[in-house]
């Protein structure tokens, strides 16, 4: 299992007629202790965070093997 957290900054706020643009920072816990930044257009900051974490998990799962700590 890949554990990750995210913070979201609003670039352009969402409105009832327009989706917003968000900057999402995602970081994982060891052995996937990387940080990634994504710019995501979504209906809300919550959805942007969920999409950012999903992208992060997909990237980490695509790695050939988990990184080894201390090397």
Per-region residue spans from a language model:
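Short N-terminal "domain-start" leader segments
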Residues: 1-21
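A short, charged, amphipathic alpha-helix used as a generic interaction element across diverse proteins
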Residues: 43-64
